[in-house]
């Protein structure tokens, strides 16, 4: 009997025939049992007829599209956009008009069923990937907090399924290079292990005009050790330990109107991530029970020339040490027409963060003292005793939570009805220390020679603690109908709630410290009075949770004996308190802030097509349309109702056409052309800065002999220019331009002993 566990939950809401973008299917690209993978725990292994919108990217596509990081997935799925800018800390993801540049992500991610709680670690070096699932729409019922935009599930190749050695090496202009090596071995029928490593390097593509050095160079690497043990016929254990390291210098940001990157202070990002996860499964005839226990530790340091000018304005450092543990217990079973899944999830995360801001002489003058020194009505001139000022902020952030969730599914012939429920509790606390120790002198502007009339030391040592907690009920409802067609097809409708937790704007503490310092200065000046109202720290740095309701209808249609597969989805999203990143007004503000818009809405459509008339030809395409606008949003000065939500593209497009033919009895040549596109997107709430729609073509030729593949490729061969990012700092506008034309060679070696 066939049992279907519906995405009643926001978990695998995939559209039908799990869209796959591979141009050529080979026997060893993925490993199936009866046509169905057996690695997923929270969702039905066969996602092809589930009542949700999703894209599955299989191993062959991962390699042919050179997916070695999260950013390369962008546009492969409709309305799924990951801009390529900044460093690996960025990991901004936008789905259906929902996204996040700072703090909590709007899209969750798991690797081999283990959740990543910090989006700082999302963009890691990928290697030996079996498949990637991109689920669109709220997945909060199964996957919990911060998945209101969707969920990414990544599954790696396992040593029980594949034995042998794999080598991947790629080199391109820049120069850039990437390599991975893996060994998979089964010691006996019950025990298998794999060891893999990878590294990458790039010298970047653009020079910093200030020092004539390339900006944006990077290097990194990773190790992974997986052990699989079949303890008994019904009990198995899987443990994976992984380490990733990345180091990047510079940021390729340039002043709007300029043709050059031109800043003077050091910029870099360094990150170490270690994780270990143990999964234990117990399978019986009536139910299965799984336990997933994980630990993750992140150490990183981001240092920026925050003004990105050849001036000594100010630099910012954000360095964290974070440890997190998670525990998920999942039970699922079936009785007749009834299928069910239930679980308990808990997590705890402890973060220590240093976030000092250092003002240089230009920053002191233009952001602080010029306010007084250039005011003719004030007879005094200020001068700090040191050429720099350190504003030091230290934080200890503790976050924990627990959730219970359940989904039920009833199968009435062709009709399927599902209900998912989740109760999620989270608590968070922030201990902060904001300190500054400096001194200044005041001089009469008319005094000759200048003689100080006042010398004042400023010592600030503010300490405090903030805390909050959130309790959220997250339901989802689905109904689907299996069409009477030979190729599996279905119609579905779903209603689900999305939820993203609230938090604190840590970067705004430097703004608060500046205000405190200016208050101290004003109170010391004769005839001047500082504001007597205290600064409400909680009011300034806190932001509320974001909530949404997603209404969706879709269809999964298979035609021509499965040679044509089409997925269609229409959706409407009602959002309350949408979290958006803004830049405080003025030419003296230095930070970014996450704030809540009152109300917004998003609606759109998605289309995926795969057509394979013969094994020679393969055509795939995906298109997404999003119309996301504010319904109510005032920032105190302006009313943005009716404006587009920033950073989310209105259109995404991907298309590929591949042709394969054999040469002799052993070689196969594949010619592939593809196109990615996105836009229009607005860069701010005022909608006065934007990037029009752009399209980037790529091409590749692959020679495949089974155990060896050689590919020649070129990305962006038209040299299309466009902006990948925009931001404002101290009244200036900056942007990052896209990478230029890239080309290179990739070698793949497969020594598959399990096929012998």
Segments and roles (model prediction):
Residues 70-73, 92-97, 110, 134, ...:
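N-terminal periplasmic accessory domains that precede
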Residues 71, 75-114:
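Extracytoplasmic beta-strand/coil segments of soluble accessory domains associated
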Residues 112-138:
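Short acidic/polar hinge/loop motifs at secondary-structure boundaries
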Residues 164-166, 171-202, 206, 210-248, ...:
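Transmembrane beta-barrel wall of Gram-negative outer-membrane proteins
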Residues 207-210, 251-262, 307-314, 356-392, ...:
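Solvent-exposed loop segments that connect transmembrane elements
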Residues 279-304, 490-496, 507, 513-595, ...:
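Membrane-embedded beta-barrel scaffold of Gram-negative outer-membrane proteins
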Residues 337-341, 347, 411-415, 425-426, ...:
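Gram-negative outer-membrane beta-barrel transporters
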Residues 341, 351, 499, 675-684, ...:
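C-terminal beta-signal and adjacent terminal beta-strands/loops
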């Amino acid at each position: 009997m066939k049992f279907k566990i519906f995405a009643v939950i926001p978990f695998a809401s995939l559209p039908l025939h799990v869209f796959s973008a591979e141009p050529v299917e080979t026997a060893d690209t993925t490993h199936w049992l009866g046509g169905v993978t057996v690695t997923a725990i929270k969702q039905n292994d066969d996602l092809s007829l589930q009542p949700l919108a999703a894209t599955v990217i299989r191993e062959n596509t991962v390699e042919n599209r050179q997916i070695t990081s999260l950013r390369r997935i962008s546009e492969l799925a409709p309305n799924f956009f990951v801009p390529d800018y900044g460093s690996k800390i960025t990991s901004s993801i936008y789905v259906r008009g929902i996204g996040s540049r700072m703090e909590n992500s709007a899209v969750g991610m798991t690797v081999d069923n283990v959740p990543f709680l910090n989006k700082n670690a999302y963009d890691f070096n990928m290697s030996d990937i079996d498949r990637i699932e991109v689920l669109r729409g709220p997945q909060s019922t199964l996957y919990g907090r911060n998945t209101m935009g969707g969920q990414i599930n990544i599954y790696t190749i396992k040593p029980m399924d594949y034995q042998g050695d794999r080598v991947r090496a790629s080199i391109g202009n820049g120069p850039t290079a990437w390599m991975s090596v893996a060994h998979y071995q089964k010691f006996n029928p019950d025990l298998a292990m794999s060891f893999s490593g990878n590294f990458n390097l790039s010298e970047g593509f653009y020079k910093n005009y200030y020092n004539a050095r390339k900006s944006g160079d990077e290097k990194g690497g990773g190790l992974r050790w997986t052990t699989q043990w079949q303890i008994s016929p019904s009990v198995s254990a899987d443990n994976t330990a992984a380490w990733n390291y990345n180091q990047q210098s510079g940021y390729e940001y340039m002043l709007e109107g300029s043709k050059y990157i031109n800043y003077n202070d050091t910029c870099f990002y360094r990150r170490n991530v270690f994780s270990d996860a143990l999964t234990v499964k117990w399978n019986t005839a009536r139910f299965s029970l799984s336990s997933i226990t994980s630990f993750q530790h992140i150490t990183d340091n981001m240092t920026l020339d925050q003004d990105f000018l050849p001036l000594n304005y100010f630099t910012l450092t954000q360095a964290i040490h974070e440890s997190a543990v998670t525990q998920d217990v999942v039970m699922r079973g079936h009785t007749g027409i009834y299928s069910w899944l239930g679980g308990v999830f808990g997590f705890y995360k402890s973060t220590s963060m240093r976030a000092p801001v250092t003002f240089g002489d230009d920053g002191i003058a233009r952001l602080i003292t010029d306010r007084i020194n250039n005011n003719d009505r004030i007879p005094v001139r200020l001068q700090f005793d040191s050429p720099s000022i350190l504003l030091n902020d230290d934080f200890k952030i503790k976050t924990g939570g627990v959730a219970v969730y359940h989904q039920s599914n009833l199968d009435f012939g062709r009709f399927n009805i599902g209900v998912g429920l989740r109760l999620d509790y989270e608590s968070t606390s922030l201990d902060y220390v904001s300190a500054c120790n400096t001194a200044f002198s005041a001089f009469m502007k008319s005094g000759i020679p200048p003689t100080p009339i006042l010398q004042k030391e400023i010592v600030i040592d503010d300490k405090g603690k903030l805390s909050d907690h959130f309790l959220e009920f997250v339901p989802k409802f689905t109904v689907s109908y299996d069409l009477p067609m030979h190729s599996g097809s279905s119609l579905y409708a779903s209603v689900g709630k999305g939820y993203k937790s609230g938090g604190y704007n840590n970067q705004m503490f430097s703004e608060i410290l500046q205000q405190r310092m200016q208050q101290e200065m004003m109170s010391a000046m004769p005839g001047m009075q500082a504001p007597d109202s205290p600064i409400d720290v909680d009011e300034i740095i806190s932001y509320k949770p974001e909530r949404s309701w997603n209404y969706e209808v879709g269809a999964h249609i298979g035609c021509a004996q499965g040679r044509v597969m089409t997925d269609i989805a229409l959706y409407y999203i009602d959002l309350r308190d949408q979290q958006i990143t803004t830049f405080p007004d003025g030419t003296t503000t230095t930070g970014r802030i996450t704030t809540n818009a009152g109300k917004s809405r998003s609606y759109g459509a998605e289309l995926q097509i795969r057509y394979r008339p013969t094994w020679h030809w393969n055509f795939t395409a995906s298109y997404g349309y999003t119309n996301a606008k504010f319904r109510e949003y005032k920032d105190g000065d302006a009313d943005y109702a009716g404006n587009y939500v920033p950073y989310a593209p209105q259109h995404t497009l991907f298309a590929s056409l591949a042709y394969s033919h054999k040469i002799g009895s052993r070689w196969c040549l594949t010619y592939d052309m593809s196109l990615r596109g996105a836009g229009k997107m607005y860069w701010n709430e005022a909608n006065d800065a934007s990037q029009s729609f752009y399209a980037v073509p790529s091409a590749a030729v692959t020679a495949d002999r089974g155990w060896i593949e050689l590919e020649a490729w070129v990305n962006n061969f038209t040299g299309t220019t466009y902006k990948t990012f925009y931001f404002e700092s101290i009244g200036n506008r900056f942007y990052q331009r896209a990478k230029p034309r890239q080309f290179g060679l990739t070698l793949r070696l497969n020594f598959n002993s399990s096929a012998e």
